[in-house]
Amino acid sequence: MNKLLIFAALALLTASPAMAQEWGNLKMKFLLGGKAPTPMKIVVTKDVDFCGRHGLVSELRTVGKGGELANVVVYLQANPAKIHPDYEAELKKEVKIDNAKCRFERHVSFIRTGQKLIIGNSDPIGHNTKADFFENTPFNDLIPSKGSITKVFDKAEKTPSGISCSIHPWMAAHLLILDHPYAGISNDKGELEIKNLPVGKHTFTVWLEPRFVTQITGQQLKRGGKWDVEVKAGNNDKGTLTIPQ
């Protein structure tokens, strides 16, 4: 009997590290190849007294002084068989997009199906938020000053979907909707991390407004921005990657 207990205890001890090795973190940093374009100034044609005071520029490319490239989206297209249990709590968190100073904050966002999206309006003027989808029901809602709307999506989308303001035509943002948590968006430093991926070979989609990325640091990606990556247990740092203009 004692031998059986000892054997069972040893089995538990040896199983725990194996379970811990089923997951890996994927990290990378994106730079824009070549000289960064000068952001195009926005011509304000509506609510000029308020919107015209903010020095608005196009956010098609947000590039740091060292070429750091923001808003690169990397995500698994398919829902993996395994999802790390730590992500369960994130479904209860709200994702927020704000109409602020006649632009959207953030420019690119990610949400999971079943998660709440809150679109607010911090401005003293009204905004009309319009979103078009392939799989989900589109909407076109007026949001008064200091107001908000709440949306929940049922289906995943294959690409980030466009969001605009019908009143202020220069306003643009994108929203990626997936039925799993494995996506990342590069920050102002060009940095992106996707945590607790299942170990193994994965095919990611790489997207940078307005299209799929075709090349990373000289490596040609498959059609539709498909990028094959082997994720090993622990940390996987892809280093600094360059996307051509």
Question: Can you name each region flagged by the protein language model?
Answer:
Residues 1-4:
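Positively charged n-region of N-terminal signal peptides that target proteins for export
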Residues 19-245:
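Extracytoplasmic copper-binding redox domains, predominantly the cupredoxin/blue-copper superfamily
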